[in-house]
Amino acid sequence: MSNFFFKNNGPFRIDKLLSLSKIITKDNFKKLKVTDIKDLTTANNSEITFFHSKKYEYLASSTKALFCITTSSLAKNLPNDCNKIIVDNVLIATAMITKTFYPNSVTDNFDFDVKDINKTSYKKKIKFGKNVLIGKNVQLGKNCL
């Protein structure tokens, strides 16, 4: 599934991805390509994920991800075929990798072309709540709430 909001700049070779993200690891991973970063559940065998809390142990144990960013204490919960990237701070490392795949997500600027829905032709056609803005490429389908 593609990301509707931001362009994915991948794929990246894992060694290049870690280098661009300023993540130093002792492991010498093969030059495998990583296509995206996803959560533990949806990551597949060409993607990287992250595991930062014991609360997600059950999900981590069945992830299909090619690589997983985690801590040394949580790594034992991952499947054997998932390459572990051991870091001190999982969330910081995840943010760095996300920035590499989706650099525009870091500077998601406000869209100055949005309009107050009260000042559009939709005003009398639909029900809406407070503080609703409409921007470019917005489509309202049937039965939207």
PLM regions with names:
Residues 1-145:
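Domain-scale signature associated with acetyltransferase and cell-envelope carbohydrate enzymes
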